[in-house]
Amino acid sequence: MKNKKSFGFPMMEEMTVQTVRQYLEKKNSVILPVGIIEQHGYHLPIITDALTAREMAKMVAKKTGILVAPVLYSSFSGGGLSGTINISPSVMSLVINDTLVSLASQGFKKIYIFLGHGGGENLNVLEISLKVLLRNNPIFSDVVLALFPVWSFDESGRGWKKAV
């Protein structure tokens, strides 16, 4: 896979349909970074949560060769300062569910969700969504879904090894 040689780890958004298929012939794991566009005071960029999730995913991908899916930039923060883009918890649940169904239907059997937003409201929405999805959708009968808040990793990125 050309992408893996160029970057040292596979990034789905940089791949072609064929290279994703080639990846799935060898591996069935994917990391889904989830962040939000929101304020972080006046000293940090509004993309901080999404960047954190993406960079942690890249760090893990570099060590494991697991594919990194494109970042989901929309989630719920409850904040309203300039630059914050909120979606409702119900829409967040739908976006997550549809994304996971899409990945599972393509053949991904191990999906690791890296949550970059530190607010408990996103964690709650994701936990409930995953439980309902696993219970009600037969496509997930042989799929492992694992949720990792990135703040549970240490400074070297350890913490993800428990499930990967």
Task: List the model feature ranges, each with a label.
Residues 40-43, 117:
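Histidine-centered active-site/metal-ligand motif
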